[in-house]
């Protein structure tokens, strides 16, 4: 079934990224911490504080 193939592909990609993140963390923990903070900032970024209150 094509749908399941798509989901499996996405799940595998996520696993790979997580593992890559762990590997990076072991090798260079300081870079990891900085990159993580930047990513969180980008994901939770709102143009306007009010945007966070809109449901």
Curated annotation (Swiss-Prot):
Which InterPro entries does the record cross-reference, listed alphabetically? Antifungal-protein_dom_sf (IPR023112)
Region (Disordered) spans which residues? 1-39
Q: Which GO terms describe its biological process?
A: defense response to bacterium; defense response to fungus; killing of cells of another organism; positive regulation of cell population proliferation
**This protein's UniProt keywords:** Antibiotic, Antimicrobial, Fungicide
**Source organism superkingdom:** Eukaryota
Basic and acidic residues bias: start-end ranges: 1-26
Membrane-crossing ranges are: none
Q: What does this protein do?
A: Possesses antifungal activity against B.cinerea, M.arachidicola, F.oxysporum, R.solani and C.comatus. Suppresses the activity of HIV-1 reverse transcriptase and stimulates the proliferation of murine splenocytes.
Q: What is this protein called?
A: Cicadin
